[in-house]
């Protein structure tokens, strides 16, 4: 239960000190208000577009020393209480941005200081930039910089009273027992067995009371007795949860190699030049899988730390394994803080505080780690920069690469992007040489260290397999490859990017495919639980498909409701039937990795096995380094190729190239077998021939002709509502305003030699209904370099809001479904 405090009463003694002004009753008869010492620009913690801009408040003299940029404050807004964040402080009201016409006599006072500063002035400026760039409210952007658990919130109780609700997550303290100088000379009586045990346990250093009690079955009385004698002392120290993540993975060592390859040396030299130039330049490390990009990161971080600065490393969530973290902690020890979604709330808070206190100087984490309070940031690294997970899926829909580039510019530090399959945007900016004032440089790393070589890639044409009578999910080449792995006692990785048992059920008589009652998506069948599950909203229904006697089609009543297609669970069953019992079959997907540390346990199981097959979805394609893996198989490469999305080919190529790179990373050669019905597709050919240009040349030509990024900026404006008509009418109004605005400005664009922004739609989304909400969207194609966000923001302010209709603006959109 979160701690609560009445706003207009006195705080309880045990609560954090909070200064309050008057109670409501006192305010009616209060003397003249307290003199104003300064003025604050306050962003209300109310995420609505109408209240996005800061408001001016006076800082009473009694708060003058406590009110700082980043402080959470209590203010009155209209007839309610609200929490807000100070983003600027000035001595004269006219100095506040946008508030030079206000009457000082009408300025309200800040009622209370609710927290110490949670972010600094630079973070406030970056949040302002994000708010404008991504057409998001400023409070949403500021929340990114808050500690896990957030800041105090103002909530209205059932009795109508406003109260402060403090974050429920709190720090914890450990009690450490240590010998005093006199204690080292103390000799316990011969009969004092417990005292001797305690003294012996403390000879090598301090130990927590918890560990002592676990080791010796309650030492509390002995500790108290020796503490009274001055033999030991007990100290309370802040416990840093989330620092004890250990792994037995053999490849988690961060030990530096004897020598760097020529490619690694070249990349490191370019990063060092960018660091010394201090212009916020970008270095793209374009290295094949297994080329040693992580070692380049580690070496670059060493130089930054030696210069007294800090470093932030972003890794895709699915790649943020114990193996990845282990390499950084092996090299940099306790100075590494880690952030990912599998940490508990308490662990996230402690890792954040480690960074804020300066105890951690290297942060390794997923997208949100970018907003940690690192002091004197000297290097930002984004590994696997092509990954779509760097794009936030909810407002503010920022891209970590773009925010990192802005941070690098402001902190005058290099931004390093690493990938074996760089995004089209990153490659285009490197071809241009500059983007948004920063220099973009591409460095190639074409070879693997040591004796490792790129794997051979074979294409298994499933059309030919079918014509030869095969009906198995495994082609002859893939079955033979698995047999060789078993004979040699090696390891294999199998990719199939569809979890569940079967992608859908279908009635063989009427063709009905059961869909979600709340979404316009087909339901996925899960064999273990005999349920149909919606992977959009999470709803599920019990079902017994054919040949179960109770199988019934929901439309026609036929019992022939059959499983269609393949999911990872079905492939797992087939592998168990095909391979010997002593081969470990390990499935890794969203269903098998739900528990805490599930990722780590599955990978440790795979690492420890003598012979094993790791089967999984895209999470097995990234960040895994197992030298014993000699075979990678792709069960069906065609799923992602023909989706209605201009990035479908790029995503498919990235996934196939990345998973292929898991093979042959040690001394033994690797082999990749890709099963497909489309062997002539440029994506398949590019992976098979280790020639990226086969795909990228084809892809760029298509994007140039159709005007898609990187040749334009793409904005997706999405609305949703329980009422289909309300959603359609609202987005139609937005489209009309945008078209009218740009039609009127067309002569100005043409005089400047620029294309006029285009509006496509509105239209219903591919997934037209989700969670009982109808969804419509429109696309804006804007010239690169034109700040289209300002035009969109102006139109949204003009159209206003409609009750029951929600809106989201996705600048540089990735998800068009």
Language-model segments: residues:
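Short amphipathic alpha-helix segments
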Residues: 726-760
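Short conserved micro-motifs at the rims of enzyme active sites and ligand-binding pockets
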Residues: 729, 771, 789-791
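Short proline/glycine- and acidic-rich turn/helix-capping motifs at secondary-structure junctions
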Residues: 750-754, 758-771, 808-817
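Short helix-capping segments at alpha-helix termini
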Residues: 332, 579-581, 741-752, 800
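Inter-lobe coupling/hinge segments of SF2-like helicase ATPases
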Residues: 251-265, 269, 279-728, 732, ...
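Accessory, non-ATPase domains that flank or precede helicase/AAA+ motor cores in DNA-metabolism machines
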Residues: 1-419, 426, 432-452, 487, ...
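Surface-exposed amphipathic alpha-helical segments in non-transmembrane regions
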Residues: 693-694, 700-701, 738-739, 744, ...
